[in-house]
Every structure is written in C-alpha cells, then in structure tokens.
Regions:
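Conserved catalytic core of sirtuin-type NAD+-dependent deacylases
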Residues: 1-307
C-alpha cells in the first residue's frame, strides 16, 4: 500500500524565468492567503510518516478525522466495489442483473429484492474481523485524538473494533439497523432480526405492514443520512489532521470532504493509488477542489510515496 502526504505548504521555488512569468498568479495566491488567513508556518517537521507521527505526539494535534472506504476491509476478506477482477461489481453475473449497480438501486430493489439479500448472505456483518486499519482508528479514539471517523463502509467493522455510534459517521449507511420501506410505517429492526431473516432465506417483511424491510444502507436514489451533513459542518473546520484510507474518492458528496479542512491542515492519503485529485478550476487559485499531488505550481501540497 502506498502513502501520500498532502501538506500545508511547499518550500520549493521556481526558477527565475518561470517565477517572473507567474507574477500575477503569485499575487492572487498571496491575496487569497491573506484573505483566508492561511498561515505560512509549517505544521509538519518533515513530509514523512515519521513527521506525521511526531505531529500526532506533539500535543498540537487533537482533532483527527479519518475518512475510510472499502480498501481498509479487503484484507478482512470483504471485496471492494471497483477492482477489475476481484471487486464486487465484477462478480455479480450470477444474479442476472441488468447492470451491476442495479443491486444497489432502490427502485430495482423494491421490485426485485432477491439479488440483494442473496449478496447480503455472503457479505453479512459478523462473518469478518476488523483489520489493523480499524484498530488504528480505535487507538486514536483511546488516546483521545479521534474527532470522528467518516466511513463509506457498510460492514460495521468499525463498530466491531470498538468505535461507538458517536465516533462514526456511516455516510453510506449500515447493516446495524433496518427499517420498513413504507413511509407510512418505517418500523425499525435490529441486526439480529435481519440476520435471522437473511440466513433463513426469507425476504425480510415487516411484522406490522408486510412491506419489505431494508437494512439502513444508502442505495442509489436515496439521500445520505442527515447526520452526515450536520456533523460535517461542525467537524471539518476543527480538524488538524485528516487521514484518508482505502477509498477511491469517486463518490460524491463523500469525496468532497477532503476539501473542507482548513488550508493549514495536513492530509495523509494511505491508498493503493492516488485519489481525490484537485478540481482544475479551483486549483488555479489554490483553494479547495481536492488534493494536488503532481502540479508544478502546487503551493500547498507535496507528495511522498512508500511501497
């Protein structure tokens, strides 16, 4: 697994010819730095994992946010979604779907729930154990350093590792609870109830109204939990270290979270590939728009790689 650091400011300087041609851009960057209150003071002593560890131990780092995706659970035996040969979407032929994503489409589910619940039997929480990544996040909590963990995962392994509901924002929902799909009912069911139904080959139906019961995972066509948005607005301005692990950062609005920390907040990406690239338009003025690892003009970010 590779590691990239997106830090607050680069010490690199352009040669004289290039610098003279970028006078206007430098002026704009300086203007935005002053306007936005971006400090030129370095946060990390060095752009290495040792530098990050030193910062965490310094006492200055008190509000760490982790953003995690399916990549932190693959070593537990749970497939990710998009890997070409081993990913979930590449291995759904047996369900005779019109297209792979249909298994997580709410309209398709209401008409054809069988494929989803067949898949759920294979991936159901309780069959897998947390990985070192999950326990690292729990360690941050135990040390009083974790502000919140924002997870795209529905496998509940963060909870198994010891995180409480307050520690977690399960952006794409969870198997932990389920609800009747009827807006007139919405009766809630717990994990054990759903597990019994799934492993008895029954399509879960509501005891009260006989409509389908669906785990509280977010399907395509459904809104993200309200708590995702309310917590996001409170948490990210206070974040002083953002750790991103095991996500391609392709799904919005989760992917946009990387741009919500302050411009002085170090961002550490631990991934098999670079992700969360900067938006070209916002990148011109060096604010927001994701992470810029490769641009020669990047004033805020540098990258290092470990294999």
């Amino acid at each position: 697994m590779d590691t990239w650091l997106a830090n607050e400011q680069s010490d690199d300087s352009s040669d004289d010819g290039e610098a003279s041609g970028d006078t206007e851009m430098d002026f704009l960057r300086n203007l935005f730095s002053k306007t936005l209150g971006i400090s030129g003071e370095k946060v990390l002593d060095e752009l290495t994992l040792e530098g990050v560890a030193s910062y965490i131990q310094s006492g200055k780092c008190k509000n760490i946010i982790c953003m995690v995706g399916a990549g932190i659970s693959t070593s537990a035996g749970i497939p990710d979604f998009r890997s070409p040969d081993t990913g979930l979407y590449a291995n759904l032929q047996k369900y005779n779907l019109p297209y792979p994503e249909a298994i997580f489409q709410i309209d398709y589910f209401k008409k054809h729930p069988e494929p989803f619940f067949a898949l759920a039997r294979e991936l159901y929480p309780g069959q897998f154990k947390p990985t070192v990544c999950h326990y690292f996040i729990k360690l941050l909590k135990d040390k009083g350093l974790l502000k919140r963990c924002y997870s795209q995962n529905i496998d509940t392994l963060e909870r198994v590792a010891g995180l409480e509901g307050e520690d977690l924002i399960e952006a794409h929902g969870t198997f932990y609870t389920s609800h009747c799909v009827s807006f007139m009912c919405r009766k809630e069911y717990d994990l054990d109830w759903m597990k019994e139904k799934i492993f008895s080959d029954d399509i879960p139906k509501c005891d009260k109204c006989s409509n389908l019961v669906k785990p509280d995972i977010v399907f395509f066509g459904e809104n993200l939990p309200k708590r995702f948005f309310t917590s996001m607005a409170m948490d990210f301005p206070r974040c002083d270290l953002l750790i991103i692990m095991g996500t391609s950062l392709q799904v919005q609005p989760f992917a946009a979270l990387v741009g919500r920390v302050s411009n002085s907040c170090p961002r550490l990406l631990i991934n098999l590939e670079k992700a969360g690239g900067a938006d070209p338009l916002l990148g011109i003025i060096s604010i927001g728009g994701g992470m810029d690892f490769d641009s020669a003009k990047a004033y805020r970010r540098e990258a290092i790689t470990f294999t």
